[in-house]
């Protein structure tokens, strides 16, 4: 990779600005000042900007994050803080959420820069299951599990939801597993049966379960097994 392209990615600036920074003696490679923007960067090179090391990325990245309330899963939002705030990674802005959560929903978010991998999670063709812990305003009705297993009619939609599995934990707390990703689906499913979601927490995507050791706002890389499970 050209040095100016790497610096542009790392700093989130244009190639022209990156070239100006390089010519301004602010970039070193293996301790030597490099002023040639076209310098060919090799994987083993150690790059620094103003003395601060810049890590090269080799291959796609995959993380799980325990999302707290109050953050959006988009990478750029003028009105709300985004989940990128928690990711202390080089060029974190290149990461995206493979399946977003609403601002008030907590739990498992998968972050990656591998578009094909995330597509296998979000594409309706792949029927990737997601499990949610749901707290309800009113006690769950006895027939809700059966209704969800058959599919329910969401407001302003023609097709029934695909069969979903409901596990009752307490009268007002349930675990719901769905294989679709319609807009606000869990909240709308309970609205369709006359109830209301007051708290929503995602526990699982496919075979990947939220690490119980992650506090809200913490994240970790996915294991090779977790990465390979999507597909």
Swiss-Prot record:
Lineage: Bacteria, Pseudomonadati, Pseudomonadota, Gammaproteobacteria, Enterobacterales
Family (UniProt): Belongs to the pseudouridine synthase RsuA family.
Record function comment: Responsible for synthesis of pseudouridine from uracil-516 in 16S ribosomal RNA.
Keywords: Isomerase, RNA-binding, rRNA processing
CDD domains according to UniProt: PseudoU_synth_RsuA, S4
Start and end residues of each S4 RNA-binding domain: 1-68
GO process annotations (BP): enzyme-directed rRNA pseudouridine synthesis
Chain's gene name: rsuA
Catalytic site positions: 102
GO cellular component, one term: cytosol
Name the record gives this protein: Ribosomal small subunit pseudouridine synthase A
rRNA processing is among the record's keywords: yes
Entry's EC annotation: 5.4.99.19
